[in-house]
Amino acid sequence: MTTRSTDQTEHLRALGQKTPYPAAGPSTDLLEAFPNRFPDRPYIVSIAFPEFTSLCPVTGQPDFATIVVEYIPDQFCVESKSFKVYMFAFRDHQSFMETITNTILDDMTTKLQPLWCRVKGLFTPRGGTQLHVFAERFKEVEPARAQALRDMVSEWKRENNRHGA
């Protein structure tokens, strides 16, 4: 017999449907969120997208990367299929690597309003140069909670680096 959680899914559009690959470029409208059932328990979500592609804004040459988004949800979590569609929207989008990484951070924080979010753009070498871009943002919260979140993130970074992720 199949059992089911009480996760709210009625409002999700992308999951369970044929995957549309947007031609219009990245937009927060592509991202969907669902309610975080554990807002009083800080935990970290890490999503890696190893098939990221975009285009150089000068040469039009393809750039390849692994994009890693890490966040501590507050009231919302990102739905993973919508995240995949959002990542694919960069495929024919021309932008610098630094702009891409910061755009993803801005879009994720706009959509989710997480307590903390970090985006790592781990770009494949091109022309003999490898570029890694890290951008992060903490949500404004009361000082005691802010320190607890910073401690948690610091521990996460130490632990995560130990595993090479």
From Swiss-Prot:
Q: Report the Pfam families cross-referenced here.
A: QueF (PF14489)
Enzyme Commission (EC) number: 1.7.1.13
A GO biological process of this protein is: tRNA modification
Q: Which GO terms describe its cellular component?
A: cytoplasm
Q: Which reaction does it catalyse?
A: 7-aminomethyl-7-carbaguanine + 2 NADP(+) = 7-cyano-7-deazaguanine + 2 NADPH + 3 H(+)
**Catalytic machinery residues:** 56 (thioimide intermediate), 63 (proton donor)
Q: What class of enzyme is it?
A: oxidoreductase
The record's annotation in SUPFAM superfamilies points to: Tetrahydrobiopterin biosynthesis enzymes-like
Statement: the UniProt record of this protein carries the keyword Ion transport: no
Q: Where in the cell is it found?
A: Cytoplasm
Q: What does this protein do?
A: Catalyzes the NADPH-dependent reduction of 7-cyano-7-deazaguanine (preQ0) to 7-aminomethyl-7-deazaguanine (preQ1).
What is the protein name for this chain? NADPH-dependent 7-cyano-7-deazaguanine reductase
Q: Which gene encodes it?
A: queF
